[in-house]
């Protein structure tokens, strides 16, 4: 399993809405993530800094990257653009983090 972590931002007035939209996520999005080898995906909110910290385990980078081209992912990204900064393709602005410690 490959562990990944990344940070995103959420608009200051959208914390509750962001959480509402994820509980639960669309069943079809969950199905796409699972079918693409995504496991143990968690997102945490730092309210003071409007930061989202995400951790995920994936089976392969290729399958993880393929999620972005699915119709359901494209619709999800568009759905989320009013609650968080987005790139021109509607993907969330994010920065990948480097793992510096892991205790199995």
Swiss-Prot record:
Active site residues per record: 22 (proton donor)
Reactions that this protein is recorded to catalyse: alpha-L-rhamnose = beta-L-rhamnose
Positions with a binding annotation for substrate: 18, 41, 76-77
Root EC class: isomerase
Family, as annotated: Belongs to the rhamnose mutarotase family.
Function: Involved in the anomeric conversion of L-rhamnose.
Native source species: Shigella flexneri
Stored PANTHER family: L-RHAMNOSE MUTAROTASE
InterPro entries with a match to the protein in the record: Dimeric_a/b-barrel, L-rhamnose_mutarotase, Rham/fucose_mutarotase
Enzyme Commission number(s): 5.1.3.32
GO terms, molecular function: L-rhamnose mutarotase activity
Record protein name field: L-rhamnose mutarotase
SUPFAM superfamilies for the chain: Dimeric alpha+beta barrel
Subunit organization: Homodimer.
Pathway: Carbohydrate metabolism; L-rhamnose metabolism
Main localization (coarse): cytoplasm
Subcellular locations according to the entry: Cytoplasm
GO CC terms of this entry: cytoplasm
UniProt xrefs under NCBIfam families: YiiL_rotase
Alphabetically ordered keywords of this record: Carbohydrate metabolism, Cytoplasm, Isomerase, Rhamnose metabolism
GO biological process: rhamnose catabolic process
């Amino acid at each position: 399993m490959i562990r990944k972590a990344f940070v995103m931002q959420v608009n200051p007035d959208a914390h509750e809405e962001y959480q509402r939209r994820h509980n639960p996520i669309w069943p079809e999005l969950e199905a796409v993530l699972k079918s693409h080898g995504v496991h143990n995906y968690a997102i945490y909110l730092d309210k003071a800094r409007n930061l989202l910290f995400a951790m995920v385990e994936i089976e392969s980078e290729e399958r993880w990257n393929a999620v972005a081209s699915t119709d359901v992912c494209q619709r999800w990204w568009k759905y989320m653009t009013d609650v968080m900064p987005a790139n021109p393709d509607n993907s969330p602005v994010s920065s990948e983090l480097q793992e510096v410690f892991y205790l199995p």
